[in-house]
């Protein structure tokens, strides 16, 4: 049990997909202007990333490896991720139309979010078991969501302050992201993962 907890902590805090592996930077910068939209995007990405980790593991171990179709890995993973995103988009459109409008173009862009594909490919490369792969995907998604919500909160606070003209907009956002990354380096000794 503690092994699974350490895996979740390791993927969320120590090996964060955004701050350490630099995956998912487009939604990290694009949807993080408001905390509400960051939470919605984070929840959608968490669902997609966790489900995609499970589905891509099943495809990897029951289709690609047994039939020696390794060369179709990226294509099949992208198709699975795209189908999962379409499912999530339909659910959000039906259940939360306001969130659907807020997320806008970024919801379909989860399909091309390199964090989702990157985690699926990292899982395939490690050769881990099913539960470990799903937990790795879930932990990565939790880390992605946590960092995006923290960053959105910081950006909301920065919008209320006076920032020098040379730093307003994207420059202060990148500086803030760098400082957030430095803060997460403090978790480096937490796990061995």
Swiss-Prot record:
GO biological process: electron transport chain
Keyword set, alphabetical order: Cell inner membrane, Cell membrane, Electron transport, Membrane, Translocase, Transmembrane, Transmembrane helix, Transport
InterPro entries: Ion_transpt_RnfA/RsxA (IPR011293), NqrDE/RnfAE (IPR003667), NqrDE/RnfAE_oxidrdctase (IPR050133)
GO cellular component terms attached to this protein's record: plasma membrane
Listed transmembrane segments: 5-25, 39-59, 62-82, 102-122, 134-154, 170-190
Subcellular locations according to the entry: Cell inner membrane
Primary location recorded for the protein, binned into one broad class: membrane
Superkingdom of the organism of origin: Bacteria
Record's bilayer topology term: Multi-pass membrane protein
EC number(s) reported in the record: 7.-.-.-
Subunit details: The complex is composed of six subunits: RnfA, RnfB, RnfC, RnfD, RnfE and RnfG.
PANTHER family, alphabetized: INTEGRAL MEMBRANE PROTEIN OF SOXR-REDUCING COMPLEX, ION-TRANSLOCATING OXIDOREDUCTASE COMPLEX SUBUNIT A
UniProt similarity note: Belongs to the NqrDE/RnfAE family.
Role: Part of a membrane-bound complex that couples electron transfer with translocation of ions across the membrane.
Name of this chain's protein: Ion-translocating oxidoreductase complex subunit A
Native source organism of the sequence: Azoarcus sp. (strain BH72)
């Amino acid at each position: 049990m503690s092994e699974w907890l350490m895996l979740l902590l390791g993927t969320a805090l120590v090996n964060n997909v955004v701050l350490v592996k630099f995956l998912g930077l487009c939604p990290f910068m694009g949807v993080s202007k408001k905390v509400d939209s960051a939470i919605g995007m984070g929840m959608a990405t968490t669902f997609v990333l966790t489900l995609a980790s499970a589905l891509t593991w099943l495809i990897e171990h029951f289709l690609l490896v047994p039939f020696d179709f390794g060369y179709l890995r990226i294509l099949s993973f992208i198709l699975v991720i795209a189908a999962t995103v379409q499912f999530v988009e339909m659910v959000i459109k039906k259940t939360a139309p306001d969130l659907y409008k807020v997320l806008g173009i970024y919801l379909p862009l989860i399909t091309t979010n390199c964090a989702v594909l990157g985690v699926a490919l990292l899982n395939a490369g490690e050769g881990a078991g099913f539960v470990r792969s799903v937990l790795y995907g879930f932990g990565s998604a939790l880390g992605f969501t946590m960092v995006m919500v923290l960053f959105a909160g910081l950006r909301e606070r920065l919008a209320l302050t006076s920032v020098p003209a040379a730093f307003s907009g994207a420059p202060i956002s990148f500086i803030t992201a760098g400082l957030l990354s430095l803060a997460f380096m403090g978790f480096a000794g937490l796990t061995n993962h």
